Amino acid sequence: MKLPIYLDYSATTPVDPRVAQKMCECLTMEGNFGNPASRSHVFGWKAEEAVENARRQVAELVNADPREIVWTSGATESDNLAIKGVAHFNASKGKHIITSKIEHKAVLDTTRQLEREGFEVTYLEPGEDGLITPAMVAAALREDTILVSVMHVNNEIGTVNDIAAIGELTRSRGVLYHVDAAQSTGKVAIDLERMKVDLMSFSAHKTYGPKGIGALYVRRKPRVRLEAQMHGGGHERGMRSGTLATHQIVGMGEAFRIAREEMAAESRRIAGLSHRFHEQVSTLEEVYLNGSATARVPHNLNLSFNYVEGESLIMSLRDLAVSSGSACTSASLEPSYVLRALGRNDELAHSSIRFTFGRFTTEEEVDYAARKVCEAVGKLRELSPLWDMYKDGVDLSKIEWQAH
């Protein structure tokens, strides 16, 4: 077993060696290095063939038509293209958008920008379980609503929204529905032939592919129209200009092919590891699971260790790569906005750690990690006067603290 142990698979995944091999074949003079847009010679034709094969592989994972897959630089760009693209194209029909308070920042910062441009955005509060229900969406719909953006799997707490049910509702009301699915590919089955989802964002690097490449699913029937956010050359049917990065696209295709073939077995294995880890750390007192216990992906365990500072705990777990909050916001010392939206108090939100397991996690690593967590929490609580008071039966919620 090698240290440190990587348990932050929701931040990024290592590239699968099979993916890396395919990517290396598209870089050098001996490989498939051509520009897919070069129509006048065999180098371009071969590159285009590789790109279209990858487009098919991405489409197959989610049961879509390959023509509905648009290459982007990642899920952040896909979210921007979907939300701004729909908002700008449909601004004459209405200027109201619905999303949730626990979306990824790529969605929330995009809707904030649209608010500055004169759009109105409703931010739905999740339940304590971290779920956004169709009823919540229905209550917020208005005559001038043009778009709903509610994610599939939450990046911090791993909860899984019922996007099929939300899609039924939005389609019946003639409102477009965008889903950020960066965290769900390879973890949850997605069938876009059956689901009434209009736009869906994907990322390669959350699914053992390379960073810097993603895709946006844009439904053809009924047809979804977008305003491009990137201009120059008219690539990707005018929706996203820029020379296609063959090696990254081929990597994403191969990663999604592997995900499709191995998803069921991998999820079963990871569910076992996650359960094993949770059972061991649950021998500690005052450990809380954040988010629904049932509607969640097995890969994610977001736990709060009461009376322990999350940042101190991370410092104590030097041999474990884990995070507090998502990688995109964990540099800020504010408690997680996702946990606060769930109604967690600041103390519990501050004491949360996200453990995320993946393809290369082993039982030995999980046992070692659980042991280290139990030791670290025990030591930190020994130093905590609040823990002593709790053990003495003091109700800390009733104490009025004096400001100095």
UniProtKB/Swiss-Prot annotation:
Its cofactor is pyridoxal 5'-phosphate. Its EC number is 2.8.1.7. One of its GO terms (biological process) is tRNA processing. The modification N6-(pyridoxal phosphate)lysine is found at K206. InterPro entries: Aminotrans_V_dom, Aminotrans_V_PyrdxlP_BS, Cys_deSase_IscS, Cysteine_dSase, PyrdxlP-dep_Trfase, PyrdxlP-dep_Trfase_major, PyrdxlP-dep_Trfase_small. Master enzyme that delivers sulfur to a number of partners involved in Fe-S cluster assembly, tRNA modification or cofactor biosynthesis. Catalyzes the removal of elemental sulfur from cysteine to produce alanine via an enzyme-bound persulfide intermediate. Functions as a sulfur delivery protein for Fe-S cluster synthesis. Cluster assembly on IscU homodimers proceeds sequentially from 1 2Fe-2S per dimer, to 2 2Fe-2S per dimer and finally 1 4Fe-4S per dimer. NCBIfam families: IscS, PRK14012.1. This is Cysteine desulfurase IscS. It comes from Azotobacter vinelandii.
